[in-house]
């Protein structure tokens, strides 16, 4: 793109936290500057900003219409959270012939401040998923007579804060499952699993203490394991698309027939993942801890405990500060760097990352028939500017595998 005498057009935000990352919450004031550097005198019709926040989902499904006829069904939905426009220089004008109303900008660097308030109503946390995203951005447009406009778009991050210091998220989570293996007319003893964690809410970087007891009364060698899964759900036109993604796992010791293993606070660390999204009508992001027993030649014995990944960490002694932004900075390692500025080619603005581009960057992944196959899949490769990377490989697994639950007998004597 030829800019002529316009050397650069950039956007900078006034950050509210010590991490120097533009992160905001509902009700915050977003302020910053549009920075313009020119190498000579230019005439300007207007310098505008457009700020917008929205959630959007999109996926396609192939349908069979019969008689060897197939078609593609598109599912799309969008929720807008805010839409703000302002003119920093000049005014709305489409007439290039009139000399009136043009502003002259001299050679050098110039700053133009902008400011707007985010809605007080809850906003969805910024997110980039396989079939949808939640994005917030500011776009600057410099309009000059007889020239194509210079446009630039820069994103900022919004957190809908989740404070894990609430009674519902501090409550312990526990469960028990049992499975009896059958082979033709021979029935072996049961395999039983009990697991408990101290609370439901955690923040990225914390380690979950897992307390579990696994009793193997079967004739097979089994292996106890645990994993954290992220579930992304996308909603459009009355349909739902769900994707499950493995984010962390651990493996216990092999357990022979008649043996019992106890986990007394076995640690599983939560990697730098996106917080839970629970208040968006078209995108939902949830987490769960799967404690399970890998059984060769049979379906795994699986126990699922719900998790909520929050943004405000645990305060065991009740020491709270009034600044939510300062609390947020304690758990923001997953953001690392500010989101980059993204210039666009005139005359129209293209999406930073289109859905088609994301699909082209995805390697095909078949559905997993067994939980263990999913665990052997790729882990979440999380690096600095996570929101504009192609999504990682996903494993779509049955959220309700065939399991049995019976009263727990003791192992038979041998």
From Swiss-Prot:
Q: What's a single GO BP term from this record?
A: temperature homeostasis
Q: Is Membrane among this UniProt entry's keywords?
A: yes
Subcellular location field: Cytoplasm; Cell membrane; Lysosome; Endosome
InterPro entries this protein is in?
Arrestin-like_C, Arrestin-like_N, Arrestin_C-like, Arrestin_domain-protein, Ig_E-set
* Chain location of the short sequence motif PPxY motif 2 per the record: 391-394
Instruction: Note down the stretches annotated as region Disordered.
Output: 393-414
- Could you list the residue ranges forming a coiled coil in this record? none
Composition bias (Basic and acidic residues) maps to 405-414
Q: Name a GO molecular-function annotation.
A: beta-3 adrenergic receptor binding
The entry's cellular-component GO terms read: early endosome; endosome; lysosome; plasma membrane
State which tissues express it: Detected in visceral fat, subcutaneous fat, brown fat and skeletal muscle, and at lower levels in kidney.
Q: Where is this motif: PPxY motif 1?
A: 346-349
Q: Where in the sequence is the signal peptide annotated?
A: none
Per the record, what phenotype accompanies loss of this gene's function?
Mice are born at the expected Mendelian rate, but there is important perinatal lethality and the majority do not survive till weaning. Mutant mice have considerably less body mass and accumulate less body fat than wild-type, in spite of normal food intake. Heterozygous mice display higher oxygen uptake, increased activity levels and higher energy expenditure than wild-type.
Its induction note reads:
Up-regulated by fasting. Transiently up-regulated during the differentiation of pre-adipocytes.
Write down a Pfam family by its short name. Arrestin_C
SMART domains per UniProt: Arrestin_C
Give the main localization category.
cytoplasm
What's in the keyword line of the UniProt record? Answer: Cell membrane, Cytoplasm, Endosome, Lysosome, Membrane, Repeat
Lipid bilayer topology: Peripheral membrane protein
The UniProt similarity line reads: Belongs to the arrestin family.
Q: How does it assemble?
A: Interacts (via PPxY motifs) with NEDD4 (via WW domains). Interacts with ADRB2. Interacts with ADRB3. Interacts with HGS (via PPxY motifs). Does not bind TXN (thioredoxin). Interacts with ITCH.
- Function of the molecule: Adapter protein that plays a role in regulating cell-surface expression of adrenergic receptors and probably also other G protein-coupled receptors. Plays a role in NEDD4-mediated ubiquitination and endocytosis af activated ADRB2 and subsequent ADRB2 degradation. May recruit NEDD4 to ADRB2. Alternatively, may function as adapter protein that does not play a major role in recruiting NEDD4 to ADRB2, but rather plays a role in a targeting ADRB2 to endosomes.
Record-given protein name: Arrestin domain-containing protein 3
């Amino acid at each position: 793109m030829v800019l002529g005498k316009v050397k650069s057009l950039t956007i900078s935000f006034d950050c509210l936290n010590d991490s120097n990352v533009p992160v905001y919450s509902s009700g915050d004031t977003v302020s910053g500057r549009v920075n313009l550097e020119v190498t000579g005198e230019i005439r300007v019709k207007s310098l505008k900003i457009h700020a917008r926040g929205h959630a959007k989902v999109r996926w396609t499904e192939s349908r069979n219409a019969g008689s060897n006829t197939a078609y593609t069904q598109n599912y799309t939905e969008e929720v807008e959270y805010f839409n703000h426009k302002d003119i920093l220089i000049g005014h709305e004008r489409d007439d290039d012939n009139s000399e009136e109303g043009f502003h002259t900008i001299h050679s050098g660097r110039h700053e133009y401040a902008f400011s707007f308030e985010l809605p007080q109503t809850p906003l969805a946390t910024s997110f980039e998923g396989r079939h949808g995203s939640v994005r917030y951005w500011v776009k600057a447009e410099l309009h000059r007579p007889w020239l194509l406009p210079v446009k630039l778009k820069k994103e900022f991050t919004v957190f809908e804060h989740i404070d894990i210091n609430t009674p519902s998220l501090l409550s312990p989570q526990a469960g028990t499952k049992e499975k009896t293996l059958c082979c033709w007319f021979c029935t072996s003893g049961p395999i039983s699993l009990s697991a408990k964690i101290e609370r439901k809410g955690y923040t990225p970087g914390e380690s979950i203490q897992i307390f579990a007891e696994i009793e193997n009364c079967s004739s097979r060698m089994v292996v106890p394991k645990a994993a954290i899964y992220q579930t992304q759900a996308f909603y459009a036109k009355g349909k739902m698309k769900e994707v499950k993604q493995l984010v962390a796992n651990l493996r216990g010791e092999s357990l022979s027939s008649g043996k019992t293993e106890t986990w007394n606070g076995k640690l599983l660390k939560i990697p730098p993942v996106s917080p839970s999204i629970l208040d968006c009508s078209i995108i939902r992001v949830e987490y769960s801890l799967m404690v399970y027993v890998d059984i060769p030649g049979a379906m795994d014995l699986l126990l699922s405990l719900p998790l909520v990944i929050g943004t405000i960490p645990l305060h065991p002694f009740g020491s709270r500060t009034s600044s939510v932004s300062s609390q947020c900075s304690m758990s923001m390692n997953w953001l690392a760097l500010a989101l980059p500025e993204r210039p666009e080619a005139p005359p129209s603005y293209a999406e930073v990352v289109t859905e088609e581009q994301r699909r082209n960057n995805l390697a095909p992944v078949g559905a997993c028939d067994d939980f263990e196959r999913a665990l052997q899949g790729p882990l979440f490769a999380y690096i600095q500017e996570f929101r504009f990377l192609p999504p990682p490989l996903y494993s779509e697994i049955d959220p309700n595998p065939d399991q049995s639950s019976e009263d727990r007998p003791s192992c038979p004597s041998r």
